[in-house]
């Protein structure tokens, strides 16, 4: 709503009468329009609220007010209201005249739409009837057409079936023609096409066609295979295959200059032709597979020419190592294992030089030597799978078998390059029953060896005691033998095919370490009364050595891989906390951490016991030194030469003897920990029990400093460059007690007047005091008796 002043304000005096009148008329018209709009809105609002008299009263009050002069505006207001009323009436008339027209137009449109809809419905009904009539008329035609289409499709299937048969027969006829003309290479190539056709037909549901196809392939495959195998065996016989003799004598019969090139050329031809039969051979021949419990890796069949080359060796193997032959003895697995290794070695040169080039020439990725080894390996695996159940519960026979198999595996991989991804004897040993038996036997024999090594007379003597450079760790024989045992166990299981099996062996090793630690603890307890004795020190050296070696092993790649495998197992089973899993994953911990922590705790306990023992004896030897008359000793100027206090001799001698004894019996790292622990206790003891318990004159302070700096500290100069840094309490106490009087007085004044820590610390540092607190220095100053008579 516009203010009343704006609506009824009189116009400004015009500069020009004409222009002023025009402006006045325009302003009046605009004011009237605004007033009409606003007034109508106000009136509607007022009437809506049901309070029209109040609205009129308020409007008059606002426009006229109490000013009598403003009554002149009434004519103008009446005129404005009249104009507004007329405009509103015109709007009402306009609206009332337009609405019926719109309604009539809408009704007309609706009527037209209804007519169109009715027309469409009539057309739809007519069309629906026509379509139904057409469908009824066309249905017999559709039925006839469907029958014809079905017949055509059936005929097409018959034609396709006949085409397949024709194609098979054509290939079969071609093979027959090639064989009649002795064209074996083309016959072999055609058989390859037939085998590929067989593979394409595998998805068909035509069982008779598939049977016919397979029977045809089988028929020609047998004929070609028999012929080529016979020819190939004949040519191999001319080469004196197989080579039973050692490699150096294999050239006999092969170096005939006239026939050798022809033989090898024919060998290559037959080899390639046999290789072509590989596809059909794989279709027809089910490869021999050991039971699934052995979890052998999937592998293709040995290529056909190598199979033929392996046949005489397979016959020999089965002849000698099956049945009741004298060579088939459960207690002698090394016989057939050594025989297989010998065969591989005897034929390696021929396979690499004569057969591999043929495979390379035809673009095959097969390695002849490894393929040959794989074929022989299957004989070994079958033999092991047969023999192991027979000797599973005879510890000696089973252990011997495992030893021989591990030696065989080592030579097979290291000498002959047999890949770890191929099927191997370790897969047989990993079978659940066999593996658990292996673990049991391994544990049993390991415990027996531990018993024997600990009961040996030389158990606690180092093998290298007379060789200084080698004997730094001073390792007793039992500890070194035990770690060698663990190392051998690692070598035995590191080639197992699965991480889970390796982790089970790792747990066995950890159990053995814990068992050995317990045995060492038992022996140690028997030697507790002689904690400085040779055997006690040997046990301590053993504990330290085992802990050190395990820490080194933790960084070995093999054990890091096992740690990662263990992490995955623990994560799957939720057997560790998130913190422990995080430590394993970040390599902050290792698989041996639990064992190392237990060994370190045992080492610390044993060292503490030794330190306590020596410290007790040192305290006993220091009784006279504690009672020294420090108050009445002559000053340094009164003595010609300073000498060691006689009462300190027992203390220093006891200390020296024990240090020499333990230096000889403990390894360097242990002895370093020992003397540092001892020095820490000795420093506090002398400071508290001797220095703080006495008063010192000038001579007493000088004598104490001489005894400490010239006699006690040098005892440890063999083990470190600055031994005084390990006796900080004694060293700084001697500094305070031996300050000249002026410096001591000045320091005392500074300490007494120091308001803050900084000034006192600076003063203490200036005289070389870093360890002792301000209160300790004040106590030491009060222990001095050589103060001047100044009241201080």
Curated annotation (Swiss-Prot):
GO cellular component, one term: Dsl1/NZR complex
Domain called RINT1/TIP20: residue spans: 220-792
Misc: According to PubMed:11096100, a longer form, which may be due to the differential initiation of translation using a non-AUG codon, may exist. However, the existence of such form has not been clearly demonstrated.
Name assigned to this protein: RAD50-interacting protein 1
Clinical disorder: Infantile liver failure syndrome 3: A form of infantile liver failure syndrome, a life-threatening disorder of hepatic function that manifests with acute liver failure in the first months or years of life. ILFS3 is an autosomal recessive form characterized by recurrent episodes of acute liver failure often triggered by infection or fever. Affected individuals also have skeletal anomalies of the vertebral bodies and femoral heads.
Organism name: Homo sapiens
One Pfam entry name: RINT1_TIP1
Gene name tied to this protein: RINT1
Protein transport found in the keyword field: yes
Recorded coiled-coil stretches: 103-124
């Amino acid at each position: 709503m516009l203010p009343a002043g704006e609506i009824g304000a009189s116009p400004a005096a015009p500069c020009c009468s004409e222009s002023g009148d025009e402006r006045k008329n325009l302003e009046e018209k605009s004011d009237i329009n605004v007033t009409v709009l606003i007034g109508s809105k106000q009136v509607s609002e007022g009437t809506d609220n049901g309070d029209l008299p109040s609205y009129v009263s308020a409007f008059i009050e606002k426009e006229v007010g109490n000013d009598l002069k403003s009554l002149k505006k009434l004519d103008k207001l009446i005129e404005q209201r009249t104009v507004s009323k007329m405009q509103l009436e015109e709007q009402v008339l306009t609206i009332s005249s337009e609405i019926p027209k719109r309604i009539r137009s809408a009704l007309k449109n609706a009527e037209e739409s209804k007519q169109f809809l009715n027309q469409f419905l009539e057309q739809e009904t007519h069309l629906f009837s026509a379509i139904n009539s057409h469908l009824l008329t066309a249905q017999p035609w559709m039925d006839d057409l469907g029958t014809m289409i079905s017949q055509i499709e059936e005929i097409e299937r018959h034609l396709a079936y006949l085409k397949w048969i024709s194609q098979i027969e054509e290939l079969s006829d071609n093979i027959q023609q090639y064989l009649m003309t002795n064209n074996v290479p083309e016959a072999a190539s055609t058989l390859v096409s037939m085998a590929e056709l067989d593979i394409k037909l595998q998805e068909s549901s035509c069982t008779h066609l598939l049977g016919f196809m397979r029977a045809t392939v089988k028929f020609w495959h047998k004929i070609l295979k028999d012929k080529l195998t016979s020819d190939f065996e004949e040519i191999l016989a001319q080469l004196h295959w197989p080579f039973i003799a050692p490699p150096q004598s294999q050239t006999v019969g092969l170096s005939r200059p006239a026939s050798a090139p022809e033989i090898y050329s024919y060998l290559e031809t037959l080899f390639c032709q046999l290789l072509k039969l590989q596809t059909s051979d794989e279709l027809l021949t089910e490869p021999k597979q050991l039971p699934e419990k052995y979890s052998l890796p999937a592998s293709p069949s040995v290529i056909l020419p190598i199979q033929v080359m392996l046949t005489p060796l397979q016959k020999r193997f089965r002849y000698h190592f099956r049945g009741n032959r004298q060579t088939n003895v459960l207690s002698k697995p090394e016989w057939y294992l050594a025989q297989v290794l010998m065969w591989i070695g005897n034929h390696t040169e021929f396979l690499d030089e004569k057969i591999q080039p043929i495979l390379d020439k035809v673009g095959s990725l097969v390695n002849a030597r490894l393929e040959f080894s794989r074929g022989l390996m299957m004989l070994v695996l079958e033999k092991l799978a047969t023999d192991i159940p027979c000797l599973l519960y005879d510890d000696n026979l089973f252990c011997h078998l495992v030893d021989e198999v591990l030696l065989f595996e080592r030579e097979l991989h290291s000498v002959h390059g047999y890949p770890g991804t191929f099927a191997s004897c370790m897969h047989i040993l990993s079978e659940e029953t066999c593996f658990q038996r292996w673990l049991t036997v391994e544990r049993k024999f390991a415990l027996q060896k531990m018993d024997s090594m600990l009961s040996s007379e030389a158990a606690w003597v180092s093998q290298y005691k007379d060789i200084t450079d080698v004997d730094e760790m001073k390792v007793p024989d039992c500890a070194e033998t035990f770690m060698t045992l663990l190392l051998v166990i690692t070598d035995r299981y590191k080639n197992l095919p699965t991480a889970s099996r390796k982790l089970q062996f790792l747990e066995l090793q950890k159990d053995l370490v814990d068992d050995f630690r317990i045995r060492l603890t038992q022996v140690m307890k028997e030697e507790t009364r002689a904690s400085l004795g040779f055997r006690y020190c040997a046990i301590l050296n053993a504990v330290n050595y085992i802990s050190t070696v395990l820490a080194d092993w933790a960084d070995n790649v093999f054990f890091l891989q096992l740690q990662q495998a263990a992490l995955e197992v623990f994560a799957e089973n939720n057997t560790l906390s998130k913190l422990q899993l995080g430590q394993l994953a970040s390599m902050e911990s290792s698989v041996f951490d639990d064992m190392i922590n237990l060994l370190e705790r045992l080492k610390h306990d044993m060292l503490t016991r030794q330190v306590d023992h020596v410290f007790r004896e040192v305290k006993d030897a220091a009784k006279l030194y504690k009672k020294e008359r420090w108050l009445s000793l002559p000053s340094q100027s009164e003595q010609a030469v300073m000498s060691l206090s006689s009462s300190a001799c027992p203390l220093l001698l006891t200390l020296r003897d024990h240090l020499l004894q333990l230096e000889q019996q403990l390894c360097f790292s242990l002895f370093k920990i020992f003397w540092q622990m001892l020095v820490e206790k000795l420093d506090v003891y002398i400071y508290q029990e001797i220095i703080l318990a006495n008063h010192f004159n000038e001579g007493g302070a000088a004598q104490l400093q001489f005894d400490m700096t010239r006699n006690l500290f040098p005892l440890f100069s063999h083990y470190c460059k600055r031994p005084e840094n390990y006796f900080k309490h004694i060293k700084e106490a001697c500094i305070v007690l031996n300050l000249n009087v002026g410096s001591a007085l000045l320091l005392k004044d500074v300490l007494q007047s120091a308001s803050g820590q900084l000034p006192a610390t600076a003063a203490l540092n200036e005289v070389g005091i870093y360890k002792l607190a301000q209160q300790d220095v004040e106590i030491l100053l009060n222990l001095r008796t050589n103060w001047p008579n100044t009241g201080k």
